Amino acid sequence: MSWQAYIDNLIANGKVDKAALYSRAGDALWAQSGSFELQQPEITEIAKGFDSAEGLQTSGLHVQGQKYFLLRADDRSIYGKHEAEGVICVRTKQTILIAHYPSGVQPGEATTLVEKLADYLINVGY
């Protein structure tokens, strides 16, 4: 399956409306939905946030120019929220998966789907 197919399948469920897959270092975009592409400082901020959440705790999480309130940050997952929408970032062995859910979607439903895809990627060596 191509990287793009993973993103397309994630979007098809209706719980996530935008997603992208980056290299673990955040230096290469592997797949994306539509125009969901982060600016380099945004993906760098996320990539560093997995190792140290201090910067995210201080200044928030930024995705496509929007600031999200940091809900959780550890070495695997970063969650952010802005009003009724949110962002889920999960780091695997070789990738960073970033997904956005719109208002009207329960955060737990979107999070479960994104985390399951990350688990799958980890299990197949990515």
Swiss-Prot record:
Major localisation: cytoplasm
Signal peptide coordinates: none
An annotated Gene Ontology molecular function: proline-rich region binding
Pfam families assigned: Profilin (PF00235)
SMART domains the UniProt entry points to: PROF
Subcellular location: Cytoplasm, Cytoskeleton
CDD domains: PROF (cd00148)
Keyword Nucleus: no
Keywords attached to this entry: Actin-binding, Cytoplasm, Cytoskeleton
One example of a Gene Ontology biological process annotation: mitotic actomyosin contractile ring assembly
GO cellular component: cell cortex; cytoskeleton; cytosol
Claim: Nucleotidyltransferase is one of the keywords in the record: no
Reported function: Binds to actin and affects the structure of the cytoskeleton. At high concentrations, profilin prevents the polymerization of actin, whereas it enhances it at low concentrations. By binding to PIP2, it inhibits the formation of IP3 and DG.
Subunit (UniProt): Occurs in many kinds of cells as a complex with monomeric actin in a 1:1 ratio.
Family as reported in the entry's similarity comment: Belongs to the profilin family.
Identification of the protein by name: Profilin
Species per Swiss-Prot/TrEMBL record: Candida albicans
Gene name for this UniProt entry: PFY1
